[in-house]
Amino acid sequence: MARQLSRKVPLAELHCHLGGAVTPAIMWSIAHAQGIKLPTRDYWEFRDTITVSDKRNRSFDGYLQLFHWTELIQSSPIAVERAVYEVVGGAYRKNNVTTTELRFNPMKRNRGGEQDLDHIIAAAARGMDRASLEYPVKPGLIFCLDRAFPFELNEIIVEKAIAWRDRGVVGVDIAGPESATFRVADYRRLFRRARQYGLGLTVHTGESGPVDEVARVVELLEPDRIGHGVKAAYDPRAMAMIRERGIVLEICPSSNLNTRVVSGWEEFRWIFDQFRRNEVRFTINTDGPEMLKTYIRDEMASLGRYGILSVEDQEQAAATSLAASFVPNVSDVPAARMEPATRVAVEREEA
């Protein structure tokens, strides 16, 4: 009996961070093209620096530290354009991902103000345009606010998202680890403003923070989707609110295992069982395919192999991803003419 989704089924990746989505070989090339001083001159050591590894302790903080170098390397218009172009095109070639929503914080790509923010955003839009000319894809950008940022900086990010909404910016997000200065209620007005201008709303919650934050985010910010959200399975009230409001979860299995937010596949089995029982809609994503060394079909395959999601469940998750995408008219994208490359073939190409 088949346990894996057909590779011909088109997919939408809704939760993918630009800092974790570019192959190490391309990151190496971008860094050298800009003359960035790297922590090592050895490519293989560099690859280990920006990807998960058994040599590194698995933790939420450890995972976030990987983004130090990737965000620095991507901090110029030229770097951002190439990064976005490579991710969108690569996702289609490797996994038949026809809709990629790439999220990033533009203020973490402008070297603390040295680079003009609008030039960074324009470069990301050009990267999407190039990929869309070459492949039958419909990408979009989500701008991440940061819990550690002062409100004034996050407000600027929302205003930039509104200003660039006609050039492929489709939503806003709140990301980053817990911060003593961050209050969900402070962002209610900002999120309402973003919604008024047609932007999709998603929030990282139910991951590293407290279980009760999920319900608080749903109540105060009224998001369309929730990034990760696995801890909602432990809160019946949160699941009821999510179901009643039609909110969709962006589940990233390998990421949650790597950060130890979820202890193992057996806990995931229980989590998905709770979501199905409570009619909570969910999608499957990578969080960062190259950083985590996994593609979206790898995630689906693992859930099928462990008997957590049936092929029908996987097909439903894929359909939900397309339906819940912030990118307009994603159903207009034609299906792939050939099957995507296997993971082995891609790794050989990179090496």
What are these regions (language model features)?
Residues 1-199, 207-225, 231-248, 253-351:
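Metal-cofactor-binding active-site regions of metalloenzymes
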